Regions:
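Short loop-to-helix capping motifs
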Residues: 160-162, 207-208
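All-alpha effector-binding/dimerization core of bacterial HTH-type transcriptional repressors
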Residues: 79-154, 192-214
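Short, hydrophobic secondary-structure boundary micro-motifs
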Residues: 30-32, 165-168, 213
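Amphipathic alpha-helical segments in well-ordered regions
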Residues: 18, 111, 115, 154, ...
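C-terminal all-alpha effector/ligand-binding and dimerization domain
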Residues: 20, 132, 136, 150-152, ...
Length: 233
């Protein structure tokens, strides 16, 4: 009986897995130039076309980067490199995937706020308070929302986990638009948001991680419920 030739997609996926394993195990270091497409294909025992597709896919994902006239390099991955990927995923999500992302955001935001309560410096707490006061003093939705985002960014930064902050930043683009719509469509939405933010700030000032976690979960949960019942077009 003749053996069935492997599907091209399967071969390409195997190449992707092999390259990522080489990076994970330190065989290819961040910033290092990849061997030529031909040499890498021979090394992994696959066709050049499958190798080309694997490299293209990893470049789109940000794992590899093409430098004109120089070759393909392993990206020097930093926490901030997660921003664009998570932002695109958040923007394109619908249905079940959106619901799952909202759950992820609620868990991460609550955890980040709890960490911030334990780690926040007086300077960082003052910055959070500045944005809270600016929200209270503002009347325009756009200005309020700008300080809203800055409020959450300051808390994420105070948590001291750059990767968590990067993921949360990437997940905020959809939430930003949702807050705009919520502010325009629901009477009293901004007042509720102000109260929720004040509760978070009080917990941070008290250096109470569990109170901070609960306040953040309640705040994000309100936005989450609103998004669940009013999906974007």
């Amino acid at each position: 009986m003749e053996e069935t030739a492997p599907r091209k997609g399967t071969v390409t996926q195997r190449a992707i897995e092999r390259i990522t394993a080489m990076i994970r195990e330190g065989e290819l270091e961040p910033g290092e130039r990849l061997p030529t497409e031909r040499d890498l294909a021979v090394r992994l025992g696959i066709s050049r076309s499958s190798m080309r597709e694997a490299i293209r896919a990893l470049t789109v994902l940000g794992v590899l980067e093409a430098r004109h006239g120089s070759g393909i390099y392993v990206t020097r991955l930093e926490a901030g490199d997660l921003l664009e990927t998570f932002g695109v995923v958040a923007d394109l999500s619908r249905g079940r995937q959106l619901a799952e992302l909202l759950e992820v955001r609620r868990v991460l935001e609550s955890t980040a706020t709890a960490l911030a309560a334990a780690r926040i410096t007086p300077e960082a707490l003052a910055l959070v308070g500045t944005h809270l006061a600016a929200m209270d003093a503002s009347d325009g939705p756009e200005e309020i929302l700008a300080h809203d985002l800055a409020f959450h960014r300051a808390i994420a930064a105070a948590a001291g986990n750059e990767t968590m902050a990067a993921i949360l930043e990437g997940l905020s683009s959809r939430t930003f638009r949702a807050r705009v719509r919520r502010g325009h469509q629901e009477e009293g939405a901004f007042d509720r948001t102000r109260r929720e933010h004040a509760a978070i700030h009080r917990a941070l000032a008290a250096r109470d991680p569990e109170a901070a976690r609960a306040a953040a979960a309640a705040h994000v949960g309100a936005v989450e419920e609103w998004l669940r019942t009013r999906p974007e077009d």
